[in-house]
């Protein structure tokens, strides 16, 4: 019954997403502009969704600039379905993009999305090209030292909210990799600065006493997938849902290894986070209140479910 209810909620949200309506303005305290987010209205219609009460009267820094300009500009690398990806018609979509739309609407401003390589999202925040970045980030100690990170948000069932991470390989290598130890000596691709880079380092390279494993970092997941297809590597480390989508689109060329990284090592860092420039506490505090409300209402689970369906990711 619980699964039926979730599928019903997801179906209702999907129907709402197909109606490209302009959202209502924020009911927050303080002086803000009415949020239209007209360019990205297709992402999410929030007009009938509950929103948290925010006091923005003492906004400072980037948050004040956002409110004054009426636009929240975010960076993303849209190669990480279902969180962020490009649809067949060329539009940016995904659960994190829906969340960003909801955040903008709660602030009463428009949303603007800048797409770029994953490594570029950090530079865009550093240089002030964007206000925030939403791009499938996990909590990492080195990130927390140089950026303001939001509270975590999860797209899975609250009873099993830890996301899984795995590796994919070619159909020719099917059955070759059955444990993490089997990847010792292999040539593995992972996206630079990603969580998967950390997982490979922590759980595969540490098993390699002779240094025979080659972890190669690439700028984009597309590079990794093309490399795997061309035989330049043996496997690619990915989020499990993203892995399923790439395998489904490979026309039988790739397979899931079904080998999972041990996520119990990182339980205290559960969930995905967004980031802003270090010191922008006014912005992060406001966004955290919004995300906490999203978690309370389980909105992100619904967004994630819809995005998975749109990305063609099957359970």
Question: What do these predicted ranges mean?
Answer:
Residues 19-23:
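C-terminal motif of bacterial Sec signal peptides marking the signal peptidase cleavage site
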Residues 26, 38-57, 61-64, 193-215, ...:
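Ligand-binding clefts/hinges and TM-proximal coupling segments of bilobed small-molecule sensing domains
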Residues 32-137:
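Extracytoplasmic small-molecule ligand-binding "clamshell" domains
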Residues 78-81, 90-106, 162-222, 240-242:
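Bilobed "Venus flytrap"/periplasmic-binding protein-like clamshell domains
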Residues 95, 99, 179-182, 186, ...:
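Short amphipathic alpha-helical coupling segments at ligand-binding clamshell hinges
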Residues 101, 105, 110-182, 263-267:
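Acidic, polar ligand-binding/catalytic clefts
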Residues 120, 136-146, 199-207, 229-230, ...:
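A ligand-binding cleft/hinge motif common to bilobed small-molecule-binding domains
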Residues 155-169, 240, 248-291, 310-315:
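Periplasmic-binding protein-like
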């Amino acid at each position: 019954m619980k699964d039926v209810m979730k599928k019903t909620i997801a179906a209702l949200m999907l129907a709402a997403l197909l109606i490209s309506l302009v959202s209502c303005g924020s009911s927050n305290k303080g002086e803000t502009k009415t949020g239209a987010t007209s360019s990205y209205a297709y992402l999410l219609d929030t007009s009938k969704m509950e929103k948290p009460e925010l006091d923005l009267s003492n906004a400072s820094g980037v948050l004040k600039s956002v409110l004054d300009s009426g636009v929240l500009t975010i960076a993303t690398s849209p190669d990480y379905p279902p969180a962020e990806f490009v649809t067949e018609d060329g539009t940016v979509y995904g659960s994190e993009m829906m969340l960003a739309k909801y955040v903008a609407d709660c602030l009463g401003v428009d949303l603007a999305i800048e797409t770029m390589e994953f490594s570029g999202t950090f530079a865009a925040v550093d240089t002030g090209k964007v206000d925030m970045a939403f791009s499938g980030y996990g909590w990492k100690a080195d990130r927390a030292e140089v950026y303001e990170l939001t509270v975590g948000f999860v797209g899975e069932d609250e009873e099993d909210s830890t996301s899984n991470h795995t590796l994919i390989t070619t159909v020719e290598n099917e059955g070759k990799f059955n444990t993490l130890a089997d990847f010792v000596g292999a040539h593995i691709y992972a996206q630079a600065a990603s969580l998967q880079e950390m997982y490979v380092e922590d759980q595969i390279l540490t098993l390699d006493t002779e240094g025979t494993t080659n972890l190669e970092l690439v700028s984009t997941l597309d590079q990794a997938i093309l490399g795997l297809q061309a035989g330049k590597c043996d496997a690619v480390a990915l989020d499990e849902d993203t892995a399923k989508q790439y395998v489904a689109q490979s026309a039988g060329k790739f397979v899931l290894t079904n080998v999972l990284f041990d996520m119990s090592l990182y339980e205290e860092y559960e969930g995905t986070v967004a980031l802003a420039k270090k010191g922008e506490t006014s912005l992060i505090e406001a966004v955290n209140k919004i995300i906490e409300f999203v978690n309370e209402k389980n909105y992100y689970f619904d967004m994630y479910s819809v995005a998975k369906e749109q990305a063609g990711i099957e359970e």
